[in-house]
Regions:
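Internal alpha/beta domain cores that form substrate/cofactor-binding pockets in large enzymes
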Residues: 5-27, 105-112, 118
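His/Asp/Glu-enriched short active-site or ligand-binding loop at hydrolase and phosphoryl-transfer sites
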Residues: 94-114, 137, 162-167
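Extracytoplasmic/secreted envelope proteins and their assembly/folding machinery
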Residues: 6-9, 31-38, 47-51, 55-58, ...
Length: 179
């Protein structure tokens, strides 16, 4: 729903709230949205309890990685959408997740606060230099990724099988915990 539609929602007395978790630059800031969403369903105390444990666990893992990483692997993200490939900002929560997990986000040009489109040629160059490739759209297998991005099968990360998606838990409609 567009922001301009909020007047209609008010007119119809339909409650609404804006959820801006996608604007968060910190993974912990993004996680904290569970408190706001818990409030919506009348379970704020439970949301606060769950969230209180997240920073502790996150920071323990972050320190464990920092103490053990010798050489940060370069990380490529995403797949094309139409003729563009959208790359997150270096200040985004996903870039921060990569850093905190011991990786090096490969796209350094976008320092703004939103994802930026790049052309497929630049994406190919980045993927060719990357040690691993994450968030590969709807692809569940390398064969599915090959069908979606046939020009990228000769990149180092594809050839080496260093391609990972955030689809460990999905429902029948394809939804998952990440999105």
């Amino acid at each position: 729903m567009c922001i301009r539609d909020r007047g209609k929602l008010k007119e119809l007395d339909i409650p609404f709230m804006y959820v801006g978790d996608y604007l968060e630059e910190s993974p912990l800031g993004k996680a904290e949205w569970l408190v706001a969403l818990s409030e919506v369903i009348g379970k704020r105390a439970e949301g606060e309890k769950v969230f209180a444990e997240i920073p502790v666990r996150y920071n323990v893992l972050k320190k464990k990685v920092a103490d053990n990483i010798l050489d940060a692997p370069s990380v490529m993200l995403n797949t094309p959408y139409g003729d563009s490939w959208f790359m997150p900002s270096t200040e985004s929560y996903v870039a921060r997740l990569i850093k905190d997990a011991g990786g090096d986000y490969i796209y350094k040009k976008n320092t703004g606060n939103a994802s930026a489109p790049i052309d497929l040629e630049e994406a190919y160059l980045l993927a060719s230099q990357a040690d691993m490739w994450l968030h590969v759209g709807m692809a569940n297998t390398l064969d599915e990724l090959k069908a979606a991005c046939p020009k990228f099968i000769d990149t180092r990360c594809f050839r080496g099988g260093q391609v990972y998606n955030n689809n460990a838990r999905t429902n029948a409609a394809g939804g998952n915990d990440y999105y």
